[in-house]
Amino acid sequence: MSREYSDTEQRNLDASRRLFAPPPGFDPATLFANDAVWWNGLPRLHAPGAGCEHRGIAAIRRLMGSANADTQHLGIDAYDLGTTRYEDLVELVDGDWVMRQHTMHAKTKAGRDYTNVYCFVMRFDAAGRIVHLTEHWNSWWADRFLFDQLAPTPAHPL
């Protein structure tokens, strides 16, 4: 069942779509308010003790930029955002809220196939910026698949 969206709802839906398919040269961090919060449920993506919240635009920029960092030496086989594609897209819009669920497919930096289901719930302010984003995903699978990818090494006697 479809319905017509209000101008505000359409603006918010368009912004959520730009977050996942930004046009060339567009900085997706500009979609967020300066005091926005991004919660993603996997504390290993943060500084130790930081929990699951990325609070403020600087923290959100660090999170978004971390996908391009070389982390293989740390045993993290991150997915390459340049290889992502989405299927099974579901979008729900209600006033200041947008919910987007999709199945994401990508290659990791080591060339492995990665697939996971994500659900993003976003709340927008009156200016059309994201003030809160909650990222639900199969974090157990991501943790097992993307992290701890260093080969075991034996102890070396003196």
Q: At which residue positions do the language-model features occur?
A:
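C-terminal and inter-domain tail/linker signature
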Residues: 1-158
